[in-house]
């Protein structure tokens, strides 16, 4: 019963609103007053692009629904609200309802109103700090900084800074005394800021009138456009000083169409036998079928977000000419995961708190790679070689044979490079190559909203002769541009197996801040020469996680939500 009563009340209010609209449209027809009023800008003052879009919409209504827009008959929602004592929100709601019936067409408009803040009211009442301080300095014919601060406090500091900036007061450095640098007497001074605030208080409800009055008291400029710009800059300055605050007022122009009527027939969706027999259907409006609306999308069978992002990265790498590496082995020996990458055996990353060590089998097989390569790695770690001093410690074969869950896919990069080194030793030629991989890695880390014990690493590398830092930066710029990050910054960092090394930061447009999006560098000679490559061969490489760009792209706050049913809804 209560719902029915509310519905009847809404119907009655809508009928009264229609009657009021009819009266206003009639006044427009008779020329009895312009209902655009001074509360907002004229409808005809719209930009050319907006006007063109509006005309196109009117033409579409005429062709598709036989609706003719009567542009000369219009009224604003603000006028309807004030004249007929209806809440503005209700006017907006009823106008939108009528637009769905094509009785009217609505155009949303907005303008700013300005009012004084508490600080602005204080300045209007007591005078602005810049005027008060300048007047005091002129009356005293000079004073000290201490006198000014003691007498006016914080207000004195504000006024002094403004006057020093405008060069109306000079500070003599020898004795810290202040002197006026303006002509005339203290009594002839005009408080300009106070004058501006008076205009805001008087005309703040009408942005156009406020700009016009401010132009009247500002120094004359050459050209109407410059004067208006000066007035707008002054308003911005007052807002910046928090002396005034702006409030955006949104309203609509309600424009009549040829379908407008003072009564609304109740809509029905079905014609029944009784409605036709009793001819009651004439009281109602039969709702038309909408053959263009889409049904509700069923959330099933969706591709996982990480798989979707992984495919995107693969497409980028392939388009840039990269080949995918074999990364199927989740379990690696410490040799490939650490030692071959010139990471010392006492490095913190090889501790239990960072790495998952395998219990069974604890050690890898005896002949896990060429013995000569193992000896080269042992020598460069223990005593150094290839121009390096090494790490100078007792290298142990037992430690390098321990099995681990790989902590990075760079271990697979190392395997791929070693195969190329063996081909070079056979043929004596270096064929430039580009490799990439995207696969899981494992870290013994505490779980939180941004860290997981397992995640995906995206890695790319290029091998060629005499590659340098400029090649790396150029490649990174091209790669990240493909994935939608065009603004990059590079920061020096340290990696055991690359030198030089760089962290890559990308600018996130939505969050308006720089985020770390990867790590990069040039593989060290201690790593490449031990494999058997000649000195002129270089390898540039970079890596990033798959999860972070996925979280940014799909606005996911908790990394754990990437796994499970939530990630496909």
Curated annotation (Swiss-Prot):
Heterotetramer; dimer of two heterodimers formed by alpha and beta subunits. Its cofactor is Mg(2+). InterPro entries: aa-tRNA-synth_II (IPR006195), aa-tRNA-synth_II/BPL/LPL (IPR045864), Phe-tRNA-synth_IIc_asu (IPR004529), Phenylalanyl-tRNA_Synthase (IPR002319). One of its GO terms (cellular component) is phenylalanine-tRNA ligase complex. Mg(2+) binds at residue 499. L-phenylalanine binds at residues 410, 457-459, 497, 523. It catalyses: tRNA(Phe) + L-phenylalanine + ATP = L-phenylalanyl-tRNA(Phe) + AMP + diphosphate + H(+). Belongs to the class-II aminoacyl-tRNA synthetase family. Phe-tRNA synthetase alpha subunit type 2 subfamily. One of its GO terms (biological process) is protein heterotetramerization. Transmembrane segments: none annotated. Inhibited by bicyclic azetidine BRD1389, which competes for L-phenylalanine. It holds the Pfam family tRNA-synt_2d. It is found in: Cytoplasm, Cytosol. Its EC number is 6.1.1.20. Keywords: Aminoacyl-tRNA synthetase, ATP-binding, Cytoplasm, Ligase, Magnesium, Metal-binding, Nucleotide-binding, Protein biosynthesis. It is an enzyme of class 6 (ligase). The identification of residues that recognize the inhibitor lays a foundation for the development of drugs against Plasmodium species as well as related apicomplexan parasites that infect humans since they are conserved among apicomplexan alpha subunits. This is Phenylalanine--tRNA ligase alpha subunit. The keyword Nucleotide-binding applies. It comes from Plasmodium vivax (strain Salvador I). GO terms for molecular function: ATP binding; magnesium ion binding; phenylalanine-tRNA ligase activity; tRNA binding. The keyword Nuclease does not apply.
